[in-house]
A protein has these predicted regions:
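Nucleotide phosphate-binding/pyrophosphate-handling subdomain across enzymes
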Residues: 1-100
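C-terminal helical cap/extension that packs against the catalytic core
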Residues: 3, 49-50, 91-150
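Short, Lys/Arg-enriched, disordered terminal segments
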Residues: 13-19, 147, 165-168
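Short glycine-/acidic-enriched loop or helix-start segments at secondary-structure transitions
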Residues: 61-62, 88-90, 113-114, 162-165
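Short, well-ordered alpha-helices that flank and scaffold nucleotide-derived cofactor binding pockets
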Residues: 66-70, 93, 119, 143, ...
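Active-site-proximal loop/hinge segments that shape catalytic or ion-binding/gating pockets
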Residues: 156
Length: 168
């Protein structure tokens, strides 16, 4: 959709338009606020800081992993689940090793078992426990987190959807 907007802008006559580059940039920076789009580095709370993101492929996780590496916190907790048609090994290789993991699965039938994620995660140096639902994983992470910790929920749009539908 954003590509379509860029295409429309590129090939439209903007010479008489009152909208300038600055306004367009501000619009893109506020797209979640203006459109109601949820789940893209969405901050849920501050103490502890809780963020969810729907990134679900290697390209998205290359970006998310950079963001996670810049987070300043005492301890990082990651509630994580995926669907089976994604590059599980490739994505798990991008996850921070210094976090505690809460491996889970969404209600979607294509979800990878939390037990499988844990096994593959351990091969990548990721340490954590398994939870049968996103909400169980979230509750455990929330209870373990201190005010100066960071909790991330993601790995799949379905994981974020389960979280947002049932926890806020």
């Amino acid at each position: 959709m954003l590509e379509d907007l860029g295409y429309m802008y590129r090939f439209s006559d903007t010479s008489s338009s009152e909208v300038r580059g600055k306004e367009i940039a501000e619009g893109f920076l506020s797209v979640c606020e203006y459109t109601g789009l949820k789940g893209r580095w969405q901050v849920i709370s501050e103490h502890p800081k809780v963020v969810c993101d729907t990134g679900h492929n290697v390209g998205g996780w290359e970006y998310i992993s950079k963001q996670l590496s810049q987070v300043e916190c005492n301890k990082m907790h990651i509630v994580f689940g995926m669907v089976e048609d994604k590059d599980i090994d490739g994505i798990l290789a991008l996850l921070p090793k210094n976090a505690t993991y809460y491996f889970t699965k969404s209600r979607n039938k294509r979800s990878v078992s939390e037990n499988v994620l844990k096994i593959i995660g351990e091969q990548q140096g990721l340490i954590g426990e398994c939870y049968p639902t996103v909400i169980d994983a979230w509750e455990s992470a929330k209870n373990a987190a201190k005010p100066d910790d960071f909790v991330f929920i993601g790995g799949s749009s379905y994981v974020v959807a389960d979280f947002l539908e049932n926890s806020i």
